[in-house]
Amino acid sequence: MSFDAFEVHGGLPLSGNITPQGAKNEALQVLCATLLTIDPVTLSNLPNILDVNRLLDLLRGLGVKVEQKSPHSYQLQADAIDLGFFETPEFRRDASRIRGSVMLIAPLLARYGQAFLPQPGGDKIGRRRLDTHFVGLQKLGAHFDYEADKRQYSVTAPEGLKGTYLLMDEISVTGTANVVMAAVLAKGTTQIYNAACEPYVQQLCRMLVQMGAKIEGIGSNLLTIEGVNELKGTEHRLLPDMIEIGSFIGLAAMTQSDITIKDARIDQLGIIPTAFERMGIKLDFEGDNIRIPQQDTYEIQTFIDGSIMTIYDAPWPGFTPDLMSIMLVIATQAKGSVLIHQKMFESRLFFVDKLIDMGAQIILCDPHRATVIGLGRKNQLRGIEMSSPDIRAGVALLIAALSAKGKSVIHNIHQIDRGY
C-alpha cells in the first residue's frame, strides 16, 4: 500500500468532542483579498489543509510577507508584490494546482492593472465555467487574452476599473467574490445582481468593509459597492467550516456514535441541520454545540403525501452541493429511500459504484440523480479497495469505510487532504 492511501478498519463506534476548522471556501477568498491593501491583515481560524497551504505558498511567491502567529493565525502584508513571478514556470505550476487561484485576478487587477491566470485546478466534478468571472471583470473594464504557448490568461485594465451594473449569468460564489474584490477599488458605483450570498461571500464583504470598503446589501443577491481609493489592514476571524460540520454529522450517524461538535456557529448553517433531520438523524443543540446522540437506526422522512423524499442542492440559502455526497452515503444505512438530485454538478455522483461494491443499494438514474434504497442496518457495508475521486466523495467514502465491516483501502487521499 502506498503512502497516498488510508487503511481503514471499520465497524467501530466513535465518541467525544470535535471542533471544526475554519471554512475552506472562505479562507481562499479572504487570503486573496489581503492583496487589496499594503497594510498587514491578520486572519485567524485559518484551516490547515492542502488547498490553503498551496495558496499561502503562491502568495509568498508573489512577494507577500506571510507570518504565522499561531497554528491557525497568520498575518499577511502585500506591500511589495513581485509581478515578475507571473512569468515563471513556478507560478504556472502552482496556480494551476488550485482552483482558488482564479480569485487572485481581481485584487491584482484592481491594484496593478494586470494579472495572469493559468488554467486552474480543483475537483474533477464536471464542467465548472470561468465565464462568470471573465464577463463580470470585463464589464468593469478588464481585457482578457489567452496565451496559448503558456496556457494562461493575461488580464489587463489599461483604463482602470469602472463601476457598472452587473447581472451575473449564474450564481457563482467565486465569481461573485472576484467581482466584489475588483469593484471595491473601481471608480464609481457597481451593482451586482444575482450575486451569491453564501456565508463565505458575506464574510468576505464584512472583512472588506472593515478594511474601508463601502458595500451595501450584504447577505442579499443585490450588492451595491461604492469604489474607494484604498483599503487598510484589519483582523478577521473565519467561520467554522459548515461542510466539515455536515461531514461530522454524517460520520456520527453512520458509525452509531455519540459525538459533540463544538463551536459550530449554528446561526450560520442555514438549512443544513434540517436536511439531516429529514434523513432521520437526531440533533441536540446545546448553545453553539451540536450533539449527535448514538442511534441504532434512523428513518428517512417522506413528503406529506407519502412520496419519496428528494434531497437536492441549490445556491444559498438552499442546500449546499458540497454535502450531497455525505447525504448519499448516510442514506445507504437508513430506513427508507431517498432521491439524491445533484443539480449543480454533473459528475459528483460517479463514486456510487464504489458504494455499490461495498453492498449499498443505489440506482444511478443519470449523471445528476441517484435513488438510494436504505439497508436499515440489516446488511452492514463491507470493506473494499477504492480511490477518492474528489474532496467530498473522498470523505463520503471514508465515512462509508469507517462504518463498514472489515478493512478498506482508500487511494488518492490527497484529494481529501485538500479540504479536510
Features from the language model and the residues they span:
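Short, structured segments at the rim of ligand-binding sites
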Residues: M1-Y420
